[in-house]
Regions:
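Short, well-ordered coil/turn elements that cap or connect secondary structure elements
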Residues: 20, 44, 114, 141-144
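Short Gly/Pro-enriched loop/turn and capping motifs at secondary-structure junctions
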Residues: 96-99, 114, 125-129
Length: 168
């Protein structure tokens, strides 16, 4: 069930904590900043951590990554997720590039069925907010609940965000 455009927050009035074995934190990180945020989320939630990697390394990162985003490409990716169906809550993390998520995130979202799952986006960025990158979740995961995302500029923001979402 998708939320309507006027309601951007997920139902956070949970009475039971999430089951750690049903929480997945999947992320793409180029410099390690997003990876650090993902590791902190995993430590706080007890969830399973999984990295997204581009199957073919970039030759010219800046030119190729920007072209992928601008042209809506979905490059081949590698992940070590064995059974996505087993997870109810999926955090998806990425750096912001050209005000968007890297193309590998679109590949991950397009290649999996998120019907009935809760997706919680988070990003890292020195200058841009998560807002402009969120459209891919609505477009590629129409049957999922998309929770409020977070731009992680400070690691101390993560725990209060998880508390606001009703996860901790």
């Amino acid at each position: 069930m998708n939320q309507n455009e006027n309601d951007t927050s997920a139902d956070t009035d949970t009475t039971e904590p999430l089951e750690a074995d049903k929480v997945l934190i999947v992320y793409y990180s180029n410099t390690g900043t997003t990876e650090s945020a993902a590791e902190q989320i995993a430590a706080l939630t007890g969830g399973t951590l999984s990295k997204i990697e581009r199957a073919e390394e970039y030759g010219d990162l800046e030119a190729e990554a920007e072209a992928e985003i601008q042209e809506g490409e979905q490059p081949e990716i590698i992940t070590d997720i064995e059974n996505l169906e087993a997870y109810d809550t999926i955090f998806v993390g990425y750096p912001i590039w050209w005000d968007e998520a890297p193309a590998m995130i679109s590949t991950f979202l397009a290649n999996n069925d998120f019907a009935g799952k809760t997706i919680i986006p988070f990003c890292t960025s020195a200058s841009d907010d998560i807002g402009n990158s969120l459209h891919i979740f609505e477009e590629l995961c129409p049957d999922a609940v998309i929770a409020d995302g977070l731009t992680v500029n400070d690691a101390t923001d993560i725990e209060p965000w998880l508390q606001d979402l009703g996860i901790l």
